[in-house]
Amino acid sequence: MTQVMNKPKKPKIISGIYRITCLANNKHYIGSSDNVMRRLKTHERELEQGSHNNRKLQHDYDEYGSGFFEFRVVFVDIPKEKLTAYEKVAIYLYDSIVMYKGYNDIWPTTNHKMFKEAYQDLLEKGLIPNREN
């Protein structure tokens, strides 16, 4: 008699944009990765260990604790070559630059045309609100 062993399925690797939110102050950190689940787990591990490279994010994590943080994927299946443009759109949408209400230190480098294309794509898919109206 032959037994078939089911191998555990590997999680699907998803590219996209993610958001880390401090629920205590509604500040956001936006990032992108060609493997968002792995990247979010890395952020969570670094914050737990007190070794995250974003000092403001680490400070608030230490102050409020893990229960006040949400780790979420916001846009999925973004082509690798377009990740930076979509990340920039998300930073814009969530006002996550430090001088506003967020943890991102800088805007990702991308040209304005790519930003507009990414913004329009998300708008057409109904994934973001139209800020023009």
Tell where the protein language model's regions lie, with residue ranges.
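Structure-specific nucleic-acid interaction/processing domains
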Residues: 2-132
